[in-house]
Amino acid sequence: MLVNKFRVKQRVANLRWVSAAVMLSLTSLHAWAFSIDDVAQKAEKLAEKGYEAPKSNLPAQFRDMKFADYQQIRFNQDKSYWNSDQTPFKLQFYHQGMYFDIPVKINEVTATEVNEIKYSTDYFNFGSVNHDPATVKDLGFAGFKVLYPINKADKHDEILSMLGASYFRVVGKGQVYGLSARGLAIDTALPSGEEFPRFREFWIEHPKPEDKHLVIYALLDSPRSVGAYRFVLYPGSDSMMDVEAKVYLRDKVGKLGVAPLTSMFLFGPNQPSPTLNYRPALHDSNGLSIHAGNGEWIWRPLNNPKHLAVSTYTIENPKGFGLLQRGRDFSGYEDLDDRYDLRPSGWIETKGDWGKGKVELVEIPTADETNDNIVAFWTPENLPEKGKPLEVKYRLHFTKDEEALHSPEQAYVMQTMRSTGDVKQSNLIRQPDGTTAFLVDFVGGKLKDLDPNTPIASQASIGDNGEIVENSVRYNPVTHGWRLTLRMKVKDNKQPTEMRAALVNGETTLTETWSYQLPANE
């Protein structure tokens, strides 16, 4: 039989071409993957350009509405994104309104492509808000939220909210929203005024059916900064979020706040309410905790000062810091509506060496609980040069397990109480003596195993603006810990007064360091 050699060669060539095409297709499919580098490329190019302020496309009717009207606009539960997909995660979106008047672009990342999630009025129920559909046709979203069956297997609850500037909030099982985290803070508490970077675009990975985490990318922008972010959200009893950031500076900044946390403190036992209130405490957080690079643990109770106050802690390679809600008994709050006893602590667990810098605490006066008046962040000693990124990684814990956030060997501060200082007279009546008293209860660690007769003492110090007139320690049989009593006099009431204390047994330090600033004019 004659063989047509040309046809054989042609078939072989065709087979080779098909094989090569298949291999190329498989290689391309395998090689395509969205990553933080894609966002970083956008950020780097954006940083080279001058800043362009975002423009609002919001009709006046929505921009001028009151909060009660904004609450009328609810997401249509039947339209949750990924509703029909085999994944435990669902997405819902925030409508623009009030001061949420700048659209953010939201994209979905699949195994093969990136697609923008387009705004539609079908996503929302507008309640009694009358509007012209034509004016909001291409409006865009203000932000988004993530839902997950965190509390019950058959019910999706909100676990993440990303709305406004670079703010986001996360909750775990049995928690309610409290403090917020941010992508970046610039010039907080400086006379020049604070700059608020904003997330202008998001990319959300479509999760696989078996995924128990959600990956989110974000592009941050502001007059003097641009940033690429990767967030990995892990829902659970204590929800966690891994954060990777690459920040580029367009121009010099006075203060760069990395891993910022924002909270609220109105009053508590260390600073009782000036007006009669049935609540013993009203706050999202009651203290700043720091785990320094040298192993020291520091606890700084929060204040609501009459004037702006800033406290700094110089540290090299911090291991962690956070704004905590210590004390979970409902009797410490007594609020059935807002449940401050269920609000999570926020803890920054650093990854890698962060170098030299400061943990900074900013306390801002507030008359009520509607204002976030507490900010904590890390500010590096050395800022990146223009065009070069500041790269940072950390894990954010949203937790009610404060027991895990201090040394198991050392005792921690259970509570700080402030009172008018007094002395007991011969007739047993207490007489105010012009001092201020602080009572600090230390519990846990090795303290709980010590004999009540152990000669525990305190190492206490005070700044130049104060004088300690009493420094005593006694066993507390109720807590099985020790209570420190400090009575102090302020020299100049117009200035704040710094104090520090820790309990010791001989040369052995038994507790974390209690650090406190008595605000001016108190």
UniProtKB/Swiss-Prot annotation:
Alphabetically ordered keywords of this record: Periplasm, Signal
Recorded GO CC terms: outer membrane-bounded periplasmic space
Principal subcellular localization: periplasm
GO BP of this protein: beta-glucan biosynthetic process
Leader sequence segment: 1-33
Pfam families per record: MdoG
Compartmental location: Periplasm
GO molecular function, one term: carbohydrate binding
Pathway, per record: Glycan metabolism; osmoregulated periplasmic glucan (OPG) biosynthesis
Keyword S-adenosyl-L-methionine appears in the UniProt entry: no
Aminoacyl-tRNA synthetase among keywords: no
Homology family: Belongs to the OpgD/OpgG family.
Known role: Involved in the biosynthesis of osmoregulated periplasmic glucans (OPGs). Seems to be required for pathogenicity.
HAMAP family, per the entry: MdoG_OpgG
Descriptive protein name: Glucans biosynthesis protein G
Organism, scientific name: Dickeya dadantii (strain 3937)
Gene: opgG
